[in-house]
Amino acid sequence: MDPQCTMGLSNILFVMAFLLSGAAPLKIQAYFNETADLPCQFANSQNQSLSELVVFWQDQENLVLNEVYLGKEKFDSVHSKYMGRTSFDSDSWTLRLHNLQIKDKGLYQCIIHHKKPTGMIRIHQMNSELSVLANFSQPEIVPISNITENVYINLTCSSIHGYPEPKKMSVLLRTKNSTIEYDGVMQKSQDNVTELYDVSISLSVSFPDVTSNMTIFCILETDKTRLLSSPFSIELEDPQPPPDHIPWITAVLPTVIICVMVFCLILWKWKKKKRPRNSYKCGTNTMEREESEQTKKREKIHIPERSDEAQRVFKSSKTSSCDKSDTCF
């Protein structure tokens, strides 16, 4: 018979056994890379010893996780994927499965047989359903472009290494007056080995109010949790108003007026100091001209007088000489 058909038939029989047992499986949750407790919940009302019992756990594919045969662990029947990953607590009748992987999720059975000389008798069965979770990292916002004209910004929000697949990823924009949620198309990728998810969204977020500062959050929603990113703050630059010349004129005009007044004052003082000197010089020149004219007049008047006197002297000297010599012309 085809091995795949055989495995499929085994799984069907195992599920049917769960259904026919009449007991709902105990739901267990554990986290990736941690430890899950698979209880057997055996009351042992007859106080039977482990040396009389055969206890083992198997998964939904009938692969044996652990077997305690008459009080001793038996590894011959343990599947390789569980080898070295289990430990049995005889006090609580619990099997611990370590280093959990996503693929460990599913149905498990704890089965106990009582070994008698006549054969094995099943005395207990416990069904468990294991869910394996992995917490996503805190969402992170990364801008992929600068703010464009205070109108919008392109950004990416991402979260990694989580399981199961999240329900929703969005961006929340808060301003002073409003709160807006932007939904994006979630991009998913799953690791082939760990089966963990990485998710992200890329959005162009427009600003509803360009006059106020804003805060952006990234939100990741799973079945159990709601993760919030650290706040991403945006401080918009205030639009520059047109240049106002009135304050400039108001500041400069008094200075100009003061400078003009000082200049006029200096000029007035300079003229005031210069004016007496000019009048003095003018008076001096006038006096000098008058004295010169008077001198000239005097010279005109005085020169003939001196000529008459000279003529008289000359005549007198001539007469006297004529008298002495008695010869005159």
From Swiss-Prot:
Q: Which cysteines are joined by disulfide bonds?
A: C40-C110, C157-C218
Q: Which residues form the Ig-like V-type domain?
A: 33-131
Task: List residues of the Ig-like C2-type domain.
Answer: 150-225
- The transmembrane residues are 248-268
Q: Where in the cell is it found?
A: Cell membrane
Q: Matching SUPFAM superfamilies, A to Z? A: Immunoglobulin
Q: Which InterPro entries match?
A: CD86_IgV (IPR037677), Ig-like_dom (IPR007110), Ig-like_dom_sf (IPR036179), Ig-like_fold (IPR013783), Ig_sub (IPR003599), Ig_V-set (IPR013106), T-cell_Activation_Regulation (IPR051713)
Single GO molecular-function term? Answer: coreceptor activity
* Gene Ontology CC: cell surface; centriolar satellite; external side of plasma membrane; extracellular exosome; plasma membrane
Q: How does it sit in the membrane?
A: Single-pass type I membrane protein
> Which regions of this chain are Cytoplasmic-facing, per the record's topological domains?
269-329
Q: Note the subunit structure.
A: Homodimer. Interacts with MARCH8. Interacts (via cytoplasmic domain) with PHB1 and PHB2; the interactions increases after priming with CD40. Interacts with CD28. (Microbial infection) Interacts with adenovirus subgroup b fiber protein.
The name on file for this protein is T-lymphocyte activation antigen CD86
